[in-house]
């Protein structure tokens, strides 16, 4: 863990709890992609399957528990409590293509051919594109609430803070995990366009709206 990865984790937590606050306060999940959140839940479950038998540190243990529990709760709210407010007609991204592609990549190029490492590689690829259904939904609706935009920007910040973390690991430890670097670049690019629009709208007091 580095200073930048810790900051990234804090931004990630802020994004999750900002979203939960928005959902609980407004009692709606309108504008949110259930498909994206189910993909993120799958990311955490497949990545942290070794949670109870490969103990690394108390920090990692607690963070993994929080990520799984909070994402599970978000999915529960969207599937049960707030289901009447879910915009299913806009959440139409074909996630089977994402899942199939990530599974193939995990089998072709895992860090090693063990079940845990294949699942870890799958989770890395999946996290890089799990936001696509949300971005696609946003593209279809054309706009979103400010709190949802804040959540997505916090996710952008989380990803952005991991860039100096990668640079540090390469420069100091000479350790490069090609899959993680490539997937991280893909994820950064996907969030990048959103961050530009966010800066031009929400940070200037305007309603978030995608350009026509």
UniProtKB/Swiss-Prot annotation:
Name of this chain's protein: ER lumen protein-retaining receptor
Residue numbers on the Cytoplasmic membrane side: 22-35, 81-96, 138-149, 200-212
Molecular function in Gene Ontology: ER retention sequence binding; HDEL sequence binding
Sequence ranges on the Lumenal membrane side: 1-2, 54-61, 111-117, 169-178
Transmembrane parts of this sequence: 3-21, 36-53, 62-80, 97-110, 118-137, 150-168, 179-199
Gene transcribed to yield this protein: erd2
Family membership: Belongs to the ERD2 family.
Signal sequence region: none
Main function: Required for the retention of luminal endoplasmic reticulum proteins. Determines the specificity of the luminal ER protein retention system. Also required for normal vesicular traffic through the Golgi.
Pfam (any one): ER_lumen_recept
Cross-referenced InterPro entries: ER_ret_rcpt
Keywords in alphabetical order: Endoplasmic reticulum, ER-Golgi transport, Membrane, Protein transport, Receptor, Transmembrane, Transmembrane helix, Transport
Subcellular location: Endoplasmic reticulum membrane
A single cellular component GO annotation: endoplasmic reticulum
GO BP terms: intracellular protein transport; protein retention in ER lumen; retrograde vesicle-mediated transport, Golgi to endoplasmic reticulum
PANTHER family in the record: ER LUMEN PROTEIN RETAINING RECEPTOR (PTHR10585)
Membrane topology value: Multi-pass membrane protein
Domain of life: Eukaryota
């Amino acid at each position: 863990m580095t200073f930048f990865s810790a900051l990234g984790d804090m931004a990630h937590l802020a994004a999750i709890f900002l979203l939960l606050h928005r959902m609980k306060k407004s009692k709606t999940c309108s504008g949110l992609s259930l498909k994206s959140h189910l993909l993120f839940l799958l990311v955490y479950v497949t990545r942290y399957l070794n949670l109870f038998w490969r103990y690394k540190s108390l920090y990692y243990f607690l963070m993994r528990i929080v990520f799984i529990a909070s994402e599970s709760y978000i999915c529960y709210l969207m599937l049960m409590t707030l289901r009447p407010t879910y915009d299913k007609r806009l959440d139409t991204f074909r996630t089977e293509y994402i899942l199939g592609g990530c599974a193939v990549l995990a089998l072709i190029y895992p860090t090693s051919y063990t079940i845990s490492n294949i699942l870890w590689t799958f989770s890395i690829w999946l996290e890089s594109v799990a936001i696509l259904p949300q971005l696609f939904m946003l593209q279809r609706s054309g706009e979103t609430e400010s709190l949802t935009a804040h959540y997505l920007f916090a996710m952008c910040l989380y990803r952005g803070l991991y860039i100096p973390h990668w640079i540090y690991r390469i420069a100091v430890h000479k350790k490069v995990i090609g899959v993680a670097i490539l997937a991280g670049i893909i994820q950064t690019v996907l969030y990048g366009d959103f961050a530009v629009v966010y800066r031009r709208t929400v940070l200037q007091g305007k309603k978030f709206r995608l350009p026509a």
